[in-house]
């Protein structure tokens, strides 16, 4: 009986210690092109588990003219969220996935010194780059002239919002310019691009010393980890570790082979040293969990983010019917 009692006491002590030692997981709801829903989505505003909103703002929206900054949308969202006891997280969008949307200011596309400001991204089947179709735009992150303008934007944003917003993240590191070099834009190489991401992340961290800084780093052009690891993605994570910038990515896909081999391993390595933020984006709710052969559940998404990636933040998209039918009910339990 004495042994049994000791076992019970030991078990209870473990249970009591867990809540105090477990790392809290913060839940935000993501609003992108549906930003206007921020103020009308009652399920978001009335669910306490949702601590705030991650809102995507395009560079083009924030700088309508050279050195003419318009942060009115950020101010409006910050004020509205504050009134409702919630926080704002900014996603700075300099890439798009539609031919219709060019993410950079118009002056960058017209002044020759910026070489167009942005370049087309492409999609194609297998390795058929000859028949590639346009699939959006990416700012010329590696172009010194464009980079200089981008850093000025960061400084202007930080001057007004550092310490007021919960955090800010860059869009994903992945760009789709093919793998053979035939579709590479002017001045682009995987090595130059790697160095540009490192430089931009350092600039973001210098600008924002109070709010959390995160680089979405999922894939890098010119390599495919782990079979063809050139050190490009690892260099970005190394910089994050050195500067204490956070890391994360735009897709939460438990046990998906491509992500497991590329970014997830590196994210897990830095967990506990820097902030980890992961996003559930369109299509993620319908992911088939390789462990079960069934569509992933909200509980499984959270468990993978918390237990494997050791995430601090999850950003949930509002894709229907999953957001209303699955996520909101789960968060209100």
Regions found by a protein language model. Give the residues of each.
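Substrate-binding cleft of secreted/luminal carbohydrate-active enzymes
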Residues: 89, 93, 242-333
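Aromatic-lined carbohydrate-recognition surfaces of secreted/lumenal glycan-active proteins
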Residues: 25-33, 165-175, 197-227, 246-255
